[in-house]
């Protein structure tokens, strides 16, 4: 049972507010929550907070805060599950969940909340069941068309137009407009991995972790059966080996409750009849043993003089992806000593950009090809430059406040674990005469990629 539900933007602006029981402090509660959240030291944001006899439970999604409040003794895990399901529902009915789609579909969001919750009690969170009661149509930024193709492919990768789904294809509502008779039978399958890495100053690997998900967004009738074939060498745990190759191993795996695993052990095939909308078919984790080299290596060189306050940092970034692969939207963040007053730079290519901001160096590279390396030479004036405690200036001892460096990036058509989707098959009988469209995408991106200087 919840008392209130509201959605805040990343700046704390209220986008949606719903009071179910009238036992709270009105809209001021949303402002109180944001004040408490931003007032925490070090940017900490616990998902459960208690203040003034009221529990605040929240999740973050696409820069938005989805918050539920209650004055009762309710399991926080059940409320977190409810918020997660509400985020999925809003994405299903609005096309995607972000500040723009919420602002364009305020009436639809309130109608959904009225059907999902009655006096703060959950009635249903089923996309299929709710479609019988929701009358408001979603307002989308532009109508979807399979002919609206650009030269930029999935995740920004260049490819042939006739082989690429448009970028807006998977971000439209699962329920078509009543005036739109051209609704396509389509299914989107994404294999998404988040990579966490910690590298020591001498280049040795201290920690590596891969969190992966197979996400499905279906625009097919709910009775359609979907068959997903994974890499046959896929194995779970260190004791299980399949075939004669090195295998593709993960430590842990979990499946959605609707997945039929009858053929998983023998052929690595998943069967399911998903409802219309979005769900996570499978989650998996891999730690400490990647089958391929890390995507990036950073080779820093630091020279500094305490007397003159001159700091020179040379960074060489090497991409160890296969030559046919590439990384996109690479951003390097390097904290700097306090008091930097100027920056001069020499970059190895004209499409790079570097600037100072919030006490750090920001180095942006739009695209890096596998097997290549880029470099940047950065010289700064830092009055009052200081070395580590009890140590003077030394080539092996960086000045106080420098580093560690962190990288963020996207790797389209690449998985760090090596897991691939072999095939995606659909039952045509439930789709009628229309030929369903299938889109399979693989993507890895950084979660916390940290290199000590």
Curated annotation (Swiss-Prot):
GO terms for cellular component: AP-4 adaptor complex; clathrin adaptor complex; cytoplasmic vesicle; cytosol; early endosome; trans-Golgi network. It comes from the Eukaryota. Residues 184-452 form the MHD domain. It is a peripheral membrane protein. It holds the Pfam family Adap_comp_sub. Gene3D superfamilies: 3.30.450.60, Mu homology domain, subdomain B. High levels in the olfactory bulb, the cerebral cortex, the granule and Purkinje cell layers of the cerebellar cortex and the CA3 region of the hippocampus. Low levels found in molecular layer of cerebellum. Adaptor protein complex 4 (AP-4) is a heterotetramer composed of two large adaptins (epsilon-type subunit AP4E1 and beta-type subunit AP4B1), a medium adaptin (mu-type subunit AP4M1) and a small adaptin (sigma-type AP4S1). Interacts with tyrosine-based sorting signals on the cytoplasmic tail of cargo proteins such as APP, ATG9A, LAMP2 and NAGPA. Interacts with the C-terminal domain of GRID2. Interacts with GRIA1 and GRIA2; the interaction is indirect via CACNG3. This is AP-4 complex subunit mu-1.
């Amino acid at each position: 049972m919840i008392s209130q539900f509201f959605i805040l933007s990343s700046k704390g602006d209220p986008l949606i507010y719903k009071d179910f029981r009238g036992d709270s402090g009105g809209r001021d509660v949303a402002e109180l929550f944001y004040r408490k959240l931003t007032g925490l030291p070090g940017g900490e944001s616990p998902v459960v907070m208690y203040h003034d006899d009221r529990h605040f439970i929240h999740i973050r999604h696409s820069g938005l805060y989805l918050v539920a409040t209650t004055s009762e003794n309710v399991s926080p895990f059940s409320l977190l599950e409810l918020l997660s399901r509400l985020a999925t529902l809003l994405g299903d009915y609005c096309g995607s969940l972000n500040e723009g789609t919420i602002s364009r579909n305020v009436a639809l969001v309130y109608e959904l909340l009225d059907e999902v919750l009655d006096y703060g009690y959950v009635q249903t969170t089923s996309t299929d069941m709710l479609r019988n009661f929701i009358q408001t149509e979603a307002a989308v930024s532009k109508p979807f068309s399979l002919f609206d193709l650009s030269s930029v492919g999935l995740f920004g990768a260049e490819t042939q137009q006739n082989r690429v789904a448009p970028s807006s294809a998977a971000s439209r509502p699962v329920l078509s407009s009543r005036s739109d008779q051209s609704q396509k039978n389509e299914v989107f399958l994404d294999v998404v991995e988040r990579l966490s890495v910690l590298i020591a100053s001498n280049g040795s690997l201290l920690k590596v972790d891969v969190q992966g998900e197979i996400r499905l967004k279906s625009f097919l009738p709910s009775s359609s059966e979907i068959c997903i074939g994974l890499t046959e060498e896929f194995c779970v745990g260190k004791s299980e080996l399949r075939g004669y190759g090195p295998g593709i191993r993960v430590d842990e795996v979990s499946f959605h409750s609707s997945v039929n695993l009858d053929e998983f052990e023998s052929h690595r095939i998943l069967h399911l009849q998903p409802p219309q909308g979005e769900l996570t078919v499978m989650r998996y984790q891999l730690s400490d043993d990647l089958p391929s080299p890390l995507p990036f290596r950073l080779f820093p060189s630091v020279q500094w003089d305490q007397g003159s306050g001159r700091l020179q940092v040379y960074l060489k970034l090497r991409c160890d992806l296969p030559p046919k692969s590439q990384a996109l939207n690479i951003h390097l963040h390097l904290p700097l000593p306090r008091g930097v007053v100027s920056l001069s730079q020499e970059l190895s290519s004209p499409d790079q950009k570097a600037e100072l901001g919030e006490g750090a160096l920001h180095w942006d590279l739009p695209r890096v090809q596998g097997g290549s390396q880029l470099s940047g030479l950065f010289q700064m004036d830092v009055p009052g430059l200081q070395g580590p405690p009890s140590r003077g200036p030394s080539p092996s001892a960086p000045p106080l406040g420098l580093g560690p460096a962190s990288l963020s990036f996207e790797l389209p058509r690449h998985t760090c674990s090596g897991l691939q989707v072999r095939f995606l098959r659909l039952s045509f009988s439930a789709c009628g005469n229309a030929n369903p469209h299938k889109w399979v995408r693989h993507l890895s991106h950084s979660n916390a990629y940290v290199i000590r200087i």
